[in-house]
A protein has these predicted regions:
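Conserved alpha-helical scaffold segments that buttress catalytic/binding sites
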Residues: 1-168
Length: 168
């Protein structure tokens, strides 16, 4: 998923729509670089269509985020995995897998969030990209509709932030 990130300002030489899809390209590169595995691979389809990038309830592209969260959870639930490795997109692609695992293993799920940013923004904060709200969503905090979709949540005392360089 790429809609959770608002990164076009980082690439002023690219047309806005092309820059916005940067996370999708990164996901494709990760897929090429990742070692092949005998484990099942499941891909969540992601639309590359760019419509009007609208902010709703404090989240840019909120409708796409809700749609893709549902699609990811549907794929996860169809396969009922015991473990999940997620490659691609921006930080919020981790929300469905982490919350699924939190529901499956309620007493044995912890998150080590390795990122330059804590991703603990909330809807209504100045920055409206959902990728900056990913960890709070895993904690069960944030947009009510999105949080209701999520099968579980991880307790804040079972969360470790690693690699922070800025507190955004």
């Amino acid at each position: 998923q790429w809609q959770g990130g608002i990164i076009n300002s980082w690439f002023p030489d690219l047309p806005e729509n092309d820059a916005s899809r940067g996370y999708f390209l990164g996901a494709q590169i990760l897929n090429l670089l990742a070692p092949k595995s005998s484990q099942q691979t499941v891909e969540v389809p992601v639309s590359l269509e760019i419509g009007e990038r609208k902010t709703e309830n404090g989240i840019t592209d909120r409708k796409a985020i809700v749609r893709q969260t549902r699609a990811a959870l549907e794929k996860i639930n169809e396969n009922n995995p015991d473990r999940i490795v997620t490659l691609g997109g921006e930080c919020s692609v981790s929300v469905p897998p982490f919350t699924y695992l939190a529901a499956k293993y309620p007493d044995n799920t912890a998150i080590i969030w390795m990122d330059a940013h804590p991703d603990i923004n909330l809807p209504g904060d100045e920055y409206t990209g959902y990728h900056a709200m990913a960890l709070t969503a895993c904690l069960g905090i944030g947009d009510e509709e999105i949080v209701r979709l999520l099968p579980g949540k991880v307790s804040a005392d079972k969360t470790l932030l690693v690699g922070l360089r800025t507190w955004e």
